[in-house]
């Protein structure tokens, strides 16, 4: 085990704590600029956010996005990344990048992937040849990508798996693989390696993993293995259990969540960072995320609705032309949705802006010590025409917020 503190390319400035819940406001200082937390990271899988240029992504206020190590390792490949000088230059992005380790994609996307102590064995999707992703190779790829935050290779299995022995093996292997990642990481003074807490829905296993990961003193800590079909009540218990144990002076990242209600609850439970493909993916199906819930603008009821996608939204899509925006209407999105990709692009612009705006408002509420009121107002609006989920009521009640 490597316990010595290594150089870090990260500074974490904790600025406020909610006096009722566990919500926190902070600033993360990274090599490509500061990032205010809590925050949502859009997912630019292949060094591109589907439907947005880097300039349009910048306009949403995004200062940290996610790239996928597995996909970039396949194409353009490590040699091209080394030649151009990393993913920032490849995609023309001047701000921060977080990369996942690539392991999750191999296990979830590829047939016949097999995990051993050595690494993840799989067949190349290009020519079917056998390949191996080890912790060392994952670090090498992420060093070539040049991401500001890089994730350890971990052993990921479905949270709902009934195989307790396999879950324990995955948790313990993730700790061992972290040690290998730390040893293989070439540029700790330029890139920040985050550990990933595993353990399924077993709270004792999660506690054990937290304690082991904390000993390794990585610049930040992720809670992984969630959003895998588990009940939301179980998800909340895992997050609550982990954040109780995690150090106050490090950022906390929950991997793979993007529904607004999940994020508002997770912030109350003490988490800082989130990512998910859902806001961009759902845009491609004609869905707009709004403060009143998700609107499917492919529905005929919007054919003569000449209002903006969301009233009072300040994104480029929704702002009037007089205010420097595009002045796009719901009727126009309805007209485009079935035939033209530009409709998906416009909704992507809106949805990403909406999530980032939600995070900015959450942060401001924490700074002003009114996060309980913020959460109450969010749920009253978002679920105005339907019942608030019981899991959210229970989770927030557990940290002193009554809905």
Residues covered by each model-derived region:
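Conserved, mostly hydrophobic/aromatic
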Residues: 33, 65, 100, 142, ...
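Short acidic/polar active-site loop segments enriched in Thr and Asp
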Residues: 63, 148, 219, 272, ...
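Structural signal for hydrophobic packing residues in well-ordered secondary-structure cores
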Residues: 146, 178, 182-185, 217, ...
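Glycine- and acidic
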Residues: 159-164, 220-227, 342-344
């Amino acid at each position: 085990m490597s316990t010595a503190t290594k150089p870090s390319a990260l500074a974490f400035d904790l600025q406020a704590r909610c006096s009722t819940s566990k919500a926190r406001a902070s600033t993360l200082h990274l090599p490509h600029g500061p990032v205010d937390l809590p925050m949502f990271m859009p997912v630019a899988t292949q060094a591109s956010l589907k439907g947005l240029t880097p300039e349009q992504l910048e306009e949403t206020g995004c200062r940290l996005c996610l790239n996928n190590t597995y996909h970039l390792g396949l194409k353009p490949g490590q040699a091209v990344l080394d030649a151009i000088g990393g993913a920032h230059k490849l995609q023309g992005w001047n701000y921060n990048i977080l990369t996942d380790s690539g392991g999750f994609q191999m296990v979830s996307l590829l047939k016949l992937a097999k995990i051993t102590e050595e690494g993840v064995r799989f067949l190349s999707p290009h020519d079917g040849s056998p390949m191996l992703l080890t912790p060392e190779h994952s670090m090498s790829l992420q060093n070539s990508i040049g991401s500001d935050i890089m994730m350890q290779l971990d052993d990921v299995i479905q949270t709902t798996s009934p195989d307790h022995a396999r879950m324990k093996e995955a948790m313990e292997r993730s700790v061992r693989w972290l040690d290998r990642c730390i040893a293989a990481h070439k540029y700790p003074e330029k890139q920040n390696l985050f550990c990933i807490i595993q353990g399924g829905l077993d709270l004792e296993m999660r506690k054990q993993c937290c304690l082991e990961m904390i000993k390794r003193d990585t610049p930040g800590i992720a809670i992984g293995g969630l959003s895998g079909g588990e009940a939301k009540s179980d998800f909340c218990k895992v997050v609550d259990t982990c954040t109780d144990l995690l150090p106050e002076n490090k950022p906390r990242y929950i991997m793979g969540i993007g529904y607004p209600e999940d994020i508002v609850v997770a912030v109350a439970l003490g988490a800082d960072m989130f990512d998910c493909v859902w806001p961009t993916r759902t845009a491609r199906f004609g869905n707009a995320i709004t403060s009143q819930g998700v609107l499917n603008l492919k529905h005929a009821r919007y054919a003569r609705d000449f209002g903006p996608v969301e009233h009072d939204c300040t994104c480029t899509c929704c702002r009037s032309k007089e205010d420097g925006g595009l002045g796009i209407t719901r009727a126009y999105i309805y007209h485009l949705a079935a035939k033209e990709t530009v409709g998906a692009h416009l909704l992507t612009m809106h949805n990403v802006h909406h999530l980032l705006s939600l995070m900015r408002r959450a942060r401001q509420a924490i700074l002003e010590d009114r996060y309980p009121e913020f959460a109450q107002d969010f749920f009253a609006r978002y679920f105005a025409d339907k019942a608030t989920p019981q899991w959210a009521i229970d989770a927030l009640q557990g940290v002193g917020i009554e809905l």
